[in-house]
Amino acid sequence: NDGFTELPELKAQTLGFRSYLKTSNYSKLTFEYHHISEYRRGGDRLNRPPHEADIAEQLNHSIDGGGLNYSLFTPDEKHRVNVYASAQHIGRDSYYGTEQNLNAYGETEDLTVVAGTQYIYSFDKCLFMPADLTAGIEYNYDNLRDEMKGYNRKTRQEVHTESAFLQNEWKNDRWSILVGGRLDKHNLIDHVIFSPRANLRFNPVRDVNLRLSYSSGFRAPQTYDEDLHVAAVGGEATMIRQAENLREEKSHSVSLSADMYRRFGAFQCNLLLEGFYTRLNHVFVLEEIGKDEEHNAVIKERRNGQGAEVAGVTVEGKVAYLSLVQLQAGVTWQKSHYTRPEKWSKDSSVPAEKRIFRTPDWYGYFTATYSPVKPLNIALSGTYTGSMIVQHMKGYIPKDIAVTTPDFFDMNLKISYDFSLYKFITLQLNAGIQNIFNAYQRDFDQGKERDSGYIYGPSMPRSYFAGAKLMF
C-alpha cells in the first residue's frame, strides 16, 4: 500500500421526479427534473486539502436538468406530433494537481439546451406499400466555460447545431424498407453535413428476421467532457488541446443480421447473428507533443488521423422458461485498427500503433435470472473482456510503452426479495457480490510518479453489497 488510491472516494446525492398530464384523450404532457450532487477525490492524503497532496484529483459537481415533452395524435392515429425541450446546467469546482500545487484549482460551467419537434404521418399505401413518413427539426445549444488559471487554460466555447431530418419507412409483415437522411449545420464547421441512412428488413418466414442497414454520422471538432480532465503522469499534469484546423470525424457503418425466434413447448428461444463494419474518416487521435509555453503541463494534441476501420461478428442468444428462468448471452469478435500506424508518444523510439487502444478483439456477457417464487429473484451476470493494448506513460516506468493487457472475466451475484407493504408500495431488500473471482488489474503504478491514466479492466475488485429500495 503506497498511500495512493486506485478507486476514488465518492459521495453522491440524487433527487428527481417524472410525471405527466393527460391534456385530452389524444395528447399528453410529460415533464421531469433531476438534481445530482457529487463529490470525488483521488490521489493521496485524502484527509487533507488537495493542494497539500502529492497527487490529487478532486471534483465537486452540481447538476440540474429537466425536460418537457408534448405528444399529440389524431383519433385515427394517422397524424402524430411530438414537441420536446430539455436543458441541463453543470457547475463544477475542480482540482487537478501534483507536487502540492496551489494553482491547480479550476471552475467549469456548462449549459446545454435541446429543443425540437417531430411529425409522423401513416400512409395506408404510399406507392406500393403502407408507410410511415417522419420529419423533424432540432436545435442544440451548448455553452461551456472552463478556467484553470494555474495551467493558463481558459476555454470559452459556444456551440449551435441546427438539424433537420426526413425518412420514410415502407413496411408490412414481410418487408420493411427505410430510406432517410439528416442535415446538420454546426457553427464550428463551415459546411452542412448530410448523414444518410437506409434499412432493409425481410422475413422469409414469420420467425426469421433478416436485416441490412447503413448509417452515417459525425463528431464535431469541439471540446468534449474528456478534454477537461487533467491526468497526472510522472508527477506532472497532462492536458488535451485541439490542433488548429481540426476537421470533423465522419463514420460510415454497415451491418447484416439474422434474428431467429423459436418456441419449444414452455421454452422461448432467440438467436441473433450480426456482422458489422465501420469506416472512420479523419479519425481523432491523440499525440503527446511536449509541454505548454509556461512548462506547467504536458500537452496531448487531438489531431486528425488518416482513418480507421472496425469490423466484427456478434452472436447473441436468449432462452426463457416460463417466468421461472431466463438466460441471455452474447460474444463479439472484432478488429479495430487505423488505416496507417499513428504516433502517440513524443519519444521517437516508441513505435506508432496501428491497433486502436483499449479495443479488445473479443468481449462478451451473460445474464441469468431465477425466480422460484414471485418475490424472490436470483441474478447471476458476467462480462468477459479480452486482451487489448493500453498506453503506459513514463514516470514510474522509464519509457512510454504500449502494454498488452490480460483478459478478464468479471462475474456478479445479486439476490433480492420484494415485500408488499401496502397496495402499490413495495420494499425490496437485496444483497450480493461484485467481481466474485476478483478479476482485477495487478500492475498499478506506485507512488507520486505514477501514470494516473494507466488503469484497465473491471472497475472494482471483489466487493460485497446490501441495499434497500422502496417502490411505489
Predicted ranges, named:
Residues 171-176, 271, 276-279, 297-393:
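Gram-negative outer-membrane beta-barrel transporters
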Residues 281-282, 384-393, 417-472:
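C-terminal beta-signal and adjacent terminal beta-strands/loops
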Residues 80-96, 211, 245-303, 309-311:
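Membrane-embedded beta-barrel scaffold of Gram-negative outer-membrane proteins
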Residues 26, 73-80, 122-132, 174, ...:
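Short loop/turn motifs that connect adjacent beta-strands in outer-membrane beta-barrel proteins
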Residues 24, 128-132, 138, 147-279, ...:
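Structural signature of Gram-negative outer-membrane beta-barrels, strongest in the C-terminal barrel
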Residues 2-14, 22-79, 87-110:
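Flexible loop and strand-edge segments within Gram-negative outer membrane beta-barrel domains
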Residues 35-39, 74, 87-91, 121, ...:
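Transmembrane beta-strands of outer-membrane beta-barrel pores
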